[in-house]
Amino acid sequence: MTQPMPGKPAEDAENELDIRGLFRTLWAGKLWIIGMGLAFALIALAYTFFARQEWSSTAITDRPTVNMLGGYYSQQQFLRNLDVRSNMASADQPSVMDEAYKEFVMQLASWDTRREFWLQTDYYKQRMVGNSKADAALLDEMINNIQFIPGDFTRAVNDSVKLIAETAPDANNLLRQYVAFASQRAASHLNDELKGAWAARTIQMKAQVKRQEEVAKAIYDRRMNSIEQALKIAEQHNISRSATDVPAEELPDSEMFLLGRPMLQARLENLQAVGPAFDLDYDQNRAMLNTLNVGPTLDPRFQTYRYLRTPEEPVKRDSPRRAFLMIMWGIVGGLIGAGVALTRRCSK
């Protein structure tokens, strides 16, 4: 059996924490604790009145409807139909609405779009100080205040964008302006692509029509030459009527003179009057070329998105959070007050 060493209980007693004594000390210094807590809370309250406020507004977007795209949709679909006829388009290509929305999202998340937007706003111009470095830092901060959050279609989450400003009305109005600005830039890019694609299809269709005309003209010239040669032979041999029972369509060119001079003369005059023969495909290409020659009708302000959540004025500010700061700094002040109370007690 182990025997306790002499003096051990006294040593343990010295090392024990006197909980009751601690609470008595804190209770005695309660004025310090409460006072410091209130002082720090009031300082935090005063800070919230002078600190720069941050309010955020959020918008959720999705792809536009056909009506929102206006004339762009019909003209883009016309070009797609041309590609389908010429076997230039894949069967699984995205819809016109998907392509328009993809361009909008690209502009919405673009750094350049955010920069150009702020540079043309009065909100930024009013906060410029005339110092290039300070203004550049301010511009970078404002660019970062527009945050694009891409959607996750596997979880049915749509794209969203958030804008932070110093007042609730500014956050709402600036976000609406930014979304419209990004849509206008997207529409401009899409119109440029439409013009380029339209010009390319026009060149292709002109080349195709010209090729069809050259083929038809070559067939026509060859047919004319064949009949003229057969007519000369018939005149030389004085063949005044058909000397064969074979239908004219089945006669080879080398025996066409057997049809006789009158029939050959009639066929020659008929061919001259009718001219080159074109098929239905040529007529369709000609009609489409006439449409392409008119050129596209561009709408600079068609809408490339639709709202699932329209921006509104926020009712709660993001920063500074008054209640949170007062509670946090009140606790810090209380802890400091407790430290002061303990220090004063020890000094006594």
Swiss-Prot record:
It comes from the Bacteria. It holds the Pfam family Wzz. Probably part of a complex composed of WzxE, WzyE and WzzE. One of its GO terms (biological process) is enterobacterial common antigen biosynthetic process. GO terms for molecular function: protein tyrosine kinase activity. Residues 52-322 are periplasmic. InterPro entries: Bact_polysacc_biosynth/exp, LPS_length_determ_N_term, WzzE. Modulates the polysaccharide chain length of enterobacterial common antigen (ECA). Required for the assembly of the phosphoglyceride-linked form of ECA (ECA(PG)) and the water-soluble cyclic form of ECA (ECA(CYC)). It comes from Escherichia coli (strain K12). Belongs to the WzzB/Cld/Rol family. This is ECA polysaccharide chain length modulation protein. It is a multi-pass membrane protein.
